[in-house]
């Protein structure tokens, strides 16, 4: 898998070059995530409003790597992060999940969160496993899928 990650790093750098935002991508491995960290003065251009362009860049790179490495496409889990945007977003989601769990505990009522991506929902589910008196469940369909946090 190390070889694939190096090729993906090179792909990310080549795409950034073609987009007119040359930058180096550093591979950073955490226990739960693999990031290609990109730092550039053109970060706002790559991130876009609410991370929209960054999500699109991640989507394109994943589609390309699915074609390049069809035998390992399900095991290649990674994200491209520009100027630590994703890292900060993950921390915000974890904080929001913990705050919501505290509210559920206090008021003994379920909370339905706003719609979010499957990745963001997974962060919430994983974060709240540390609360044995709280249950989480994803409900809804498509872009309206959200997490419901309820007391046990």
Where in the sequence are the language-model features?
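RNA-contacting regions in translation and RNA-metabolism proteins
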Residues: 1-152
């Amino acid at each position: 898998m190390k070889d694939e990650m190096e090729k993906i790093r090179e792909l990310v750098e080549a795409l950034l070059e073609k987009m007119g935002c040359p930058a180096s991508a550093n591979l950073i491995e955490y226990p739960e995530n693999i990031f290609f960290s990109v730092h550039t003065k053109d970060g706002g251009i790559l991130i876009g409003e609410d991370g929209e362009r960054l999500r699109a860049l991640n989507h394109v790179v994943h589609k390309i790597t699915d074609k390049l490495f069809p035998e390992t496409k399900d095991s290649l889990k990674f994200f491209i992060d520009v100027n630590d945007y994703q890292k900060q977003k993950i921390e915000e989601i974890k904080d929001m999940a913990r705050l919501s769990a505290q509210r559920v505990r206090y008021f003994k009522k379920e909370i339905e969160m706003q719609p979010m991506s499957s990745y963001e929902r997974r962060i919430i589910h994983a974060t709240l496993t540390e609360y044995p008196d709280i249950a989480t469940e994803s409900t809804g369909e498509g872009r309206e899928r959200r997490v419901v946090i309820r007391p046990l």
